[in-house]
Amino acid sequence: MANSGLQLLGFSMALLGWVGLVACTAIPQWQMSSYAGDNIITAQAMYKGLWMDCVTQSTGMMSCKMYDSVLALSAALQATRALMVVSLVLGFLAMFVATMGMKCTRCGGDDKVKKARIAMGGGIIFIVAGLAALVACSWYGHQIVTDFYNPLIPTNIKYEFGPAIFIGWAGSALVILGGALLSCSCPGNESKAGYRVPRSYPKSNSSKEYV
């Protein structure tokens, strides 16, 4: 079974990845204006996120505008929104569950097997949360690539990957790896290791009585 150090490492990785997912969901830099071809814009930079689009001037001032209509958004953007929100909610739930089952905490009672199962459940929830975020970021990234190579879209309104999508990929990987380490807390190994089959020794010949 995984020791408390391995559990703590997995929880720390998953927590760090979840914080990254929160950051990438909130910031608007999922797409950034492309400078490919003749599209050379030095006066301003345009960004698009899950909730708003922003324009940054050369002076450093940024102005953002929230999306007015949900129905006017693309299906990929709406799906990415939903998956990221689900990922964050599952990650928060996984943190609570994993904390109850970790060896270094007093929550969840003193039953080691029960705590190991709780920690393993938290790790599985972390993995599901990371996969949801990974699918969301990959789907959104695929849409960016598709639009970039679409000849019907003018060059001056094409976008490239923004920093947020890379943060999302990195955060997803950390959450999945951290959840995998927590899932190594399999209670079966410990229960088998804690029980030893008693050995039977043959009786010594000296104990026999001779007439």
UniProtKB/Swiss-Prot annotation:
Matches recorded under PROSITE patterns = CLAUDIN
Q: Which GO terms describe its cellular component?
A: apicolateral plasma membrane; basolateral plasma membrane; bicellular tight junction; lateral plasma membrane; plasma membrane
Q: Name one GO molecular function term.
A: structural molecule activity
Q: Identify the stretch annotated as signal peptide in this record.
A: none
Q: Topology with regard to the membrane?
A: Multi-pass membrane protein
Respond yes or no to whether keyword Membrane is given for this record: yes
Location of region: Interactions with TJP1, TJP2 and TJP3: 210-211
Modifications made to the protein after synthesis: Phosphorylated.
The induction field says: By androgens.
Q: Might you name a Gene Ontology BP term for this protein? A: cell adhesion
Q: Which family does it belong to?
A: Belongs to the claudin family.
Question: This chain belongs to which protein, by name?
Answer: Claudin-7
Q: What organism is the protein native to?
A: Homo sapiens
